[in-house]
A protein has these predicted regions:
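C-terminal structural segments of small proteins and small subunits
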Residues: 45-74
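Absolute protein N-terminus
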Residues: 1-2
C-alpha cells in the first residue's frame, strides 16, 4: 500500500521510501522519513494534490510522488 492509497482520516506508518524522484528527496528534507506516523488530511477535488500531516505540520504533494512512499495503515 502507498501513501496515495490512503483516504482522509487514515493514519499510517511510513515503511519504505523510493528515492528515485527528486521531489521525494525534498519531502524527506522536510521530515517525511521512514518510521514516522503520517495522516491523510485532505484530497483535492479531482484527486490531486494530497494534503498529508506529520509532526504537527501539513504538506501537499502530488499523487505521483505519494506512490513512492510505502505505508502500513494504523
Amino acid at each position: 500500500m502507498t501513501l496515495a492509497d490512503l483516504v482522509p482520516g487514515d493514519t499510517a506508518k511510513l515503511e519504505k521510501i523510493d528515492t528515485h524522484d527528486p521531489g521525494v528527496i525534498k519531502l524527506m528534507i522536510l521530515g517525511m522519513v521512514e518510521d514516522i506516523t503520517v495522516s491523510m488530511e485532505n484530497i483535492a477535488i479531482g484527486g490531486d494534490p494530497l494534503e498529508v500531516g506529520f509532526f504537527g505540520s501539513s504538506v501537499s504533494l502530488r499523487k505521483e510522488q505519494a506512490r513512492h512512499f510505502k505505508v502500513s495503515r494504523i
